[in-house]
Amino acid sequence: MQEIQKNTKKEQYNLNKLQKRLRRNVGEAIADFNMIEEGDRIMVCLSGGKDSYTMLEILRNLQQSAPINFSLVAVNLDQKQPGFPEHILPAYLEQLGVEYKIVEENTYGIVKEKIPEGKTTCSLCSRLRRGILYRTATELGATKIALGHHRDDILQTLFLNMFYGGKMKGMPPKLMSDDGKHIVIRPLAYCREKDIVRFAEAKAFPIIPCNLCGSQPNLQRQVIADMLRDWDKRYPGRIETMFSAMQNVVPSHLCDTNLFDFKGITHGSEVIDGGDLAFDREEIPLQPAGWQPEEDDTALEALRLDVIEVK
């Protein structure tokens, strides 16, 4: 009995510690990118996956102690997939007392009609959902649209664009929507997927699997995700350093003439960002810069990604 109580206390301690870390990560992202302002009405896109559940939970937690006032409204898109448990989210949100709206649109039927069997449905599904979410935000009077992408999603997108798109483009923590009417935010931008997985398990969120896109094997994003997880396991700190690199871009040492005026460099120009390393080997630290392992770090098994593709 004492052993059980001891384990329970330890589990609660670890959960509190994990929640504080996630809350700190979300708070820092909100502050760094000015994601939430006084009087904002945040439309929290809730898919029924671990990421969006975690986002809603942390935002609700921050709402209670934030120095500003903002409101939350959870929105779920019921895409009419066969077997979708439509009762789960309403029951969960009513229990929490969270304002919500379930939007019913048969995007599943459209995707199955337009996309040949065996082909990737993500692109079309993403475009359809994006339009519906923008429309719903307008109807609800939302000032911000919150999506549940985390740090690992952002890095995966960067590598996807480098490997397959030939460009260095990630997934911004905050952006203006392509219709120019909505601000999209990603409060989990600084959060590690492994932390979200553990938090979702500890909180026992009623996870709803995605039978439309999650069942498709060999997606390019999944290949990148597996690669990054392998790196994280074999080279601790590498993921943190790569994400830090996205926040420390040096245009003068890349090759994009739109970002830096290379043609304008002439005799007498000032030395920029350390100058030339062509004749000197740059000293690279043996350990990732600024990285400190967490006490409860564990390797994360390969999981289906729970994301709403709005880029």
UniProtKB/Swiss-Prot annotation:
PANTHER family: AMINOTRAN_5 DOMAIN-CONTAINING PROTEIN (PTHR43686:SF1), SULFURTRANSFERASE-RELATED (PTHR43686). Its main location: cytoplasm. The lineage of its organism: Bacteria, Pseudomonadati, Pseudomonadota, Gammaproteobacteria, Enterobacterales. Gene3D superfamilies: HUPs (3.40.50.620). Catalyzes the ATP-dependent 2-thiolation of cytidine in position 32 of tRNA, to form 2-thiocytidine (s(2)C32). The sulfur atoms are provided by the cysteine/cysteine desulfurase (IscS) system. Homodimer. Keywords: 4Fe-4S, ATP-binding, Cytoplasm, Iron, Iron-sulfur, Magnesium, Metal-binding, Nucleotide-binding, RNA-binding, Transferase, tRNA processing, tRNA-binding. Its EC number is 2.8.1.-. One of its GO terms (biological process) is tRNA thio-modification. This is tRNA-cytidine(32) 2-sulfurtransferase.
